[in-house]
Amino acid sequence: EVLDFVQSWTLEELQEFSRQRVNKNTKFLGLSATFSIRFKTLYEFAYWFKKEHPDILIIGGSQAFHNCEGLPLDYMVHGYGEIAMSAILSGDVKYTEHKWLNGHSFRRVDATHNYMAARMKDLSTHYEERDYIEPQEVLTVEFGRGCIFNCHFCTLTYRNIKDDHSRSEDNLYEELLENYNKWGTTNYSISDETVNDYTEKIERFAGSIKKLPFKPNMAGYIRGDLLVHKQKDWQAIE
């Protein structure tokens, strides 16, 4: 069960949602965001949840520690968490002990080294009827994780990666086609750190996208300076 737009919910709504969903089979509550999840309502809900369900793990995740500062976490996963989550739930995970400034202790799991999930070839998300996806919505899609550049201002963990770290083109094609057939989705936000970090990636995915029975609208972060010198990339993006 994934709850989006949580910052728009009231504390009472989050509590009611929890009462409806949490049962004896619930293993954990996950809190995660691309950027900060440090807002008052979520703090209040997380502490309420831990008081109500002390035996259920609260697992947080982000690329940066400070994004989860102060939350009552049992585990904090640093990096992409798919493989690390399996290790946590199996009870066989490597971790180090840490403490927030407010005194709360938690276990940090380093998914940037011990449980690397940056080179997964299947990055698809499968939505369900209860997600209520509307045709005009903008969904997120991943081409790959990490970046080949090593910019000095960047704090991204997976940078300066020189090999092909992107997903398979068939996997991307199948995800986009599934979303179109089920929900009528044509609009996407590409979550890659740099969409046009290397030409081969753009060419592969452009080939897959051109096979689709529709033309998707996609937006993502690109380096414009690279396009000036790479006419082939312009053609692939268009």
Q: Where are the regions a protein language model picked out?
A:
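Acidic, low-complexity intrinsically disordered segments
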Residues: E1-L176, Y180-G184
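Conserved SAM/AdoMet-binding glycine-rich loop
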Residues: E169, Y173-E238
